[in-house]
Amino acid sequence: MKCNNLLYGVELPMCLQSSMGMVVVTGLAIVYLVIYILIYSFTHGPRLSRRLASYVVIGPYEAIAKSRPAMALQRAMVDLTRRDVRTDWYPLNNLLMNKPHRLSENGHKTSGAVRDAARNLITSAITSLGMDKYEISPGGHTVDEQLASHRHYAVNDLHRASADDAVKENAVIVAIDTDYYLRDPSIYFSNNNPFILHTFQPITVAGKDGDVRFTISDNQVDYRVDGGGRWQHKVWNWCDYGEFLYLKNILGILSINWWLSFFGIRKVIYQKIQHARPWVDCPNRALVWGLPQFTRYMITWLPIEMNARELSRVNYQCASRPGWNCLVDHTSTKLVASIGREGNDCHVELAKEDLDVVLGLSTMQSVTSRLLQMGYKQPQTLATVCQFYNSAAYDILSCSIVARPSQPPVHWPLASEIDQPTTSFRNYSNNIVTCGNLCPQLKRWEVLSNSLEHRVTMVANNKVPTPRIARFAEEYVRLVVPEANVGVPYSLEDARKELDKPTQVNAVNQIWETVDMEVRRLIEAFVKNEPTNKSGRIISSFADSRFLLKFSTYTLAFRDEVLHAEHNRHWFCPGLTPNEIADKVCDYVRGVATPAEGDFSNFDGRVSAWCQENVMNAVYHRWFNRKFSKELQKYTSMLVSCPARAKRFGFQYEPGVGVKSGSPTTCDLNSVLNNFTQYAAVRLTKPDLSPQEAFEQTGLSFGDDSLFDKQYQLRWNYVVEQLGMELKVEPFDPSNGVTFLARVFPDPYSTNTSFQDPLRTWRKLNMTSRTCVPVESAALDRVSGYLVTDKYSPVTSEYCHMIERCYMNTAESVTRRRQRKDCDREKPYWLVSGGAWPQREGDYELMMRVTAARTGFEESKLINLISQFQSVHDPWDIKPLDYQEPSPYKDTLDIDGQPVDAVDERQYQNERNTVNLRAGAAISQMPVPSVPGGEDCNRQSADMPGPKSSEGSEQLQGLPEQDGSNRLQCHRQPTFKAKGGSNTKGRSRKSRNGGRSISSKTANPTTHEVGGGNGKTRVTIAKRSGPKRPHNVVSNAWETLNDNR
């Protein structure tokens, strides 16, 4: 007889493994037991005889031990050493949601969300129990101060120091996706502590765990994570039949249990195992928790009568059919068998009773016929079951698998009904930094509504400055335009030649034959399709291209004759080439003591009507001849006040008095207002200077970008505040260089070299919005522009070379890519509109130092990242830099669905009410201001909630209120009252569309009054008869018109 006890993997001495040795060990054990019984008998009296009898008498059940002394000895050992350690705990009381979700798409957002939810559930359950958490190989989201057993096996384990803390009495042992790798779970789970696991317990032999594929071969799970790693491991049978597990206590060196183990006596703990599968999207995931019940000692070389199971690995292989896996699942109301070949993705599930029936048939034809009769009609099921019946085990297809890429994160408005992210962007590599930009969801009306609230409504500015600043405005207008009433606009033909961009040419061609018609007063807004960290920027495009063409005859002439004149050359930068701007920046920085960078917050939205009329538009009216005043006044007034609606969704809104980004004046007049704030600051700081001398002291202006002298900072902030705007002046730091137009000049005192702002570039460099183009071609087109403008920029240039190397062999040819009209759409603006910025190869080290200083990453980390770019062969293998600064995101939700910053409940409710109101308003057809003979402006709403209908806006239904008036209910939207409904009840209203009247006597009998986005009452037709009118849509891609020349 050989003793199979092990002590740390070493067998007992040979002298004790012989027959004589076993006799000695048994004799010593009996002596020990007799001594214990004698002592016990003196203390417990008459009960001892009955207790001793229970050890010896076999009892009503069949005996396991063949020897009565051996049975008595084992029974006595168990009875005399048992100890009650029962605990009670139900962690599912802390379950918050059974279908968690992440907002960002990283390739495994579903399974990742479930793991996050499991971690939160476990943490909150332990906290509510009043106990401490002891985690095995904790992940990066675990607080470092928590107790843990931590080793460095995976790269992510390096987030904290190695540790092997002692398990305290008040601790719950936790393992999240790590129990598979334990060689012996008894090391942790044989203490008197409860434990809880988030583990993988598949119910099929292959398939998907949320959004992650897995197969099983040789009883090892092959778990392939898109956007993550590939893991292979066996699975412990936590969810097998058997309520109680027995685990042998781990021996401490020189402890009592250690000495007892020499005699084959071991301490055992019984854990009560419970499990649940609470997550709908990941049924293969289980939450397993163990509750300690009892402990006792046992003699390992004697039979044991206790009924409990021992933990083991799951065996998925089918013993009777080599090469096949078979698993029976009882999580539903009936047994379901899952079969599939080892390592293959193909698997089928069918009722276990049905599989038992078909396996007993004599021919394969009978198998197929019986399966069809049972209702299994899928060809995959029939073929696989027949192969299983025939015991056909074929070679596993060995091939490389391309992981599904992660998707760009999106901006989620707080007040929205969005379920799934919809964006037109794609990633073509992993992020360079962890805090990538967010992408707008252009197809959602809530996104536009959110941008309107945060960029128009909430920043509306009606402030009027002091009389002193008003006098400075009069001086400034005269300085910019020394000669009054001498200007003549360009002809329409000349303006048409100047508007030479493809979108501009197309728009002008569509209205050229009707250019003599009156201009329609209408703004159509949409969210700009660009990555951002907050609410997306709004493009307020003027719907009528006649306005843009006719107004451009004035703006182009004014820029050429006035703004580019010699007296304005020192401050006005639009229209210059990158080389000219770089030289201008260096000359200005060298000419002042300390430069200062001006950073306006929401410049367009915060411009007041006073600024528009007394500074921006005033320079036009002063220069042009009086005979053009009436026409010019008509155009400039539209910049301040004009009806507006959502271009895609149709709802009306109040555009405010701020700058309209689609106007041809945007860049020029923003520069004028920007420079005026500098002029007023100089006048206040140095009142002894003449107006002309103060004007010459102003810095550089390009739209809302500015570079100024630091000595005027205090008064500059004061002037901007008086105008109702916000300005942040960045202090000059030589280690960070100087920034102008998002270009960093590392040392403008010695070189005009510049490079793109690193973090601003890296956050969006791996994205493309050209969804209809193969991703390889879109990536190459995008990075080719950066390799011209930033040929020597650290990290940026190496990343672009890496993308070229990885995609060059699989992308289309350069000729094919250049044939697309949008091939230059994502290239840097300056490459298309002026050429490359100057960069010297010898300044690389200088740019590296400044890049490290601006981003906060050490140079060594950047060099390691560059080395990674140069060595990888797959752009998805790069590891992003971990950006530790506070989150740059605003007005959105994080990946857990929580707001990233504090939320005002009233503001949130107002935004939600506005979103619901605009949703209802957008469903109906909108009467839009126009002139007789103009185009019909009615546009059908797009991507709105509710089913599409050929009956127009029939889903907008009127519901009676108690007072007899109507309220409106929009499909899938909360009920809301129409604004102003009671004021127009019973009256017809004149439509502004051609002067036609809409009344109850028209052919459209049902009308409802709806409050538009601007709060005005309007009439919507609930049902129309007759054919629909065609939509005359004019292409309006004029948002870059202000960057002409």
Curated annotation (Swiss-Prot):
Transmembrane segments: none
Keyword set, alphabetical order: Nucleotidyltransferase, RNA-directed RNA polymerase, Transferase, Viral RNA replication
Comp. bias regions, Polar residues: 1033-1045
Gene Ontology biological process terms in this record: DNA-templated transcription
EC code(s) of this entry: 2.7.7.48
Top-level taxon in the UniProt lineage: Viruses
Residue ranges of every copy of the RdRp catalytic domain listed in the record: 593-718
Protein name: RNA-directed RNA polymerase
Organism: Macrobrachium rosenbergii nodavirus (MrNV)
Lineage: Viruses, Riboviria, Orthornavirae, Kitrinoviricota, Magsaviricetes
